C-alpha cells in the first residue's frame, strides 16, 4: 500500500519537483541564411507559418491590435487578413485540417476560421496560449512552461503532455513552435536560441544560436531590435516546397530563409 501511495504521490508532483529524465547532449547547429526579405510593415510576431505559398503571422497587441498577417515571401509586402482588435493578445497560430487556429495569451479563447477566413465556433484553452503547431493528427501547444500539450483539433482537449528536457533539467519558457521533418522546433522566450525537440521523448536534440541573425542585420534594423528587450527571436516556420525554414522575431524588420547545418 505504501509503495502504491508513493507512486501516486510521485505522479501528482509538478514537473519541476521530480528529477528530469536523462537525455543525450544536444547537437549544436547553425542557421545558414540563403536569403532575407525585408517586410514593409512590422508586427509583434507571436506565431509564424508557411501556408499556400505565403508566410502567415499572428501578432500580439503590444503596439496596437492583434492580427493575422499574410506576408509575400518575395517582396515582404504585409497584408492584414484578420483583425482581432485590442481586446485580445494574439498568440500562436497554425493551419490544420482546412482550418486556421489562433490562440490568445490569457483570454483562454481560441479563434477558428475556415479556409476562406470565415469565423467558426471558438474553442476554449484552459492554459495560457503561447506557441501552436501540429503534426499529422494533433495540435501541439506551449504555455510558457516546460511542457508541450498534444491537443484534439476538434475541441482542444488534452490528449498527451510532454515535458521538455535539456542538459538534465526541464526547459522552461517554451514559446513559438513548428513541427517539421518529424521534430518540434521551438523558440525559448527571452533567449537567443532555438531548440529541436523529440516529440516522442521530449529531449532537446539540437540547439541553434540565433545571435548571428542579429549581427547580420542592417544597422537601422539592428537599432530597432536593440531598442527594446521584448524584441527577441520568435517565429519559426518550414516551407516543404523549398525545404527552407523561415526565422524572425518580435518586431523584426526582416525574415530569414535558410537551412540548419552542423555548427563548426
Question: Could you tell me what each predicted segment is?
Answer:
Residues 237-264:
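Blade-level signature of beta-propeller repeat domains, shared across WD40, Kelch, NHL, RCC1
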Residues 110-167:
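Hydrophobic, well-structured mid-protein blocks that either form specific transmembrane helices
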Residues 21-41, 73-76, 220:
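A short helix->beta-strand "capping" segment at the edge of beta-propeller domains
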Residues 34-67, 82-94, 239, 249-253:
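Beta-strand-rich domains and repeat architectures in extracellular enzymes and scaffolds
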Residues 71-76, 114-118, 153-156, 198-202, ...:
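Short loop/turn segments that connect beta-strands within beta-propeller blades
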Residues 57-62, 100-107, 141-145, 186-190, ...:
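Conserved beta-strand positions in repeat-built beta-propeller and related beta-rich domains
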Residues 75-113, 117-129:
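Blade-loop segments of beta-propeller domains
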Residues 41-52, 86-96, 125-142, 168-182, ...:
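Beta-rich, blade/repeat-based domains predominating
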Amino acid at each position: 500500500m505504501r509503495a502504491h501511495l508513493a507512486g501516486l504521490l510521485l505522479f501528482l508532483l509538478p514537473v519541476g519537483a521530480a528529477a528530469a529524465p536523462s537525455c543525450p547532449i544536444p547537437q549544436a547547429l547553425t542557421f545558414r541564411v540563403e536569403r532575407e526579405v525585408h517586410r514593409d510593415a512590422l508586427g509583434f510576431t507571436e506565431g509564424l507559418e508557411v501556408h499556400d505559398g505565403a508566410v502567415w503571422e499572428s501578432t500580439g497587441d503590444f503596439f496596437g491590435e492583434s492580427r493575422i498577417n499574410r506576408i509575400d515571401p518575395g517582396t515582404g509586402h504585409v497584408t492584414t487578413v484578420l483583425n482581432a482588435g485590442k481586446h485580445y493578445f494574439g498568440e500562436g497560430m497554425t493551419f490544420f485540417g482546412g482550418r486556421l487556429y489562433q490562440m490568445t495569451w490569457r483570454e483562454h479563447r481560441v479563434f477558428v476560421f475556415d479556409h476562406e477566413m470565415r469565423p467558426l465556433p471558438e474553442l476554449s484553452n484552459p492554459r495560457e496560449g503561447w506557441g501552436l503547431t501540429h503534426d499529422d493528427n494533433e495540435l501541439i501547444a506551449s504555455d510558457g512552461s516546460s511542457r508541450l500539450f498534444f491537443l484534439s483539433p476538434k475541441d482542444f482537449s488534452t490528449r498527451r503532455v510532454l515535458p521538455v528536457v535539456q542538459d538534465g533539467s526541464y526547459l522552461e519558457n517554451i514559446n513559438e513552435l513548428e513541427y517539421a521533418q518529424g521534430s518540434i522546433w521551438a523558440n525559448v522566450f527571452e533567449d537567443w536560441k532555438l531548440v529541436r525537440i523529440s516529440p516522442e521523448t521530449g529531449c532537446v536534440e539540437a540547439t541553434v544560436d540565433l545571435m548571428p541573425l542579429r549581427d547580420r542585420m542592417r544597422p537601422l534594423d539592428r537599432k530597432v531590435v536593440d531598442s527594446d528587450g521584448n524584441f527577441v527571436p520568435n517565429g519559426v516556420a518550414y516551407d516543404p516546397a523549398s525545404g527552407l525554414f523561415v526565422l524572425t522575431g518580435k518586431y523584426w524588420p526582416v525574415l530569414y530563409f535558410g537551412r540548419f547545418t552542423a555548427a563548426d
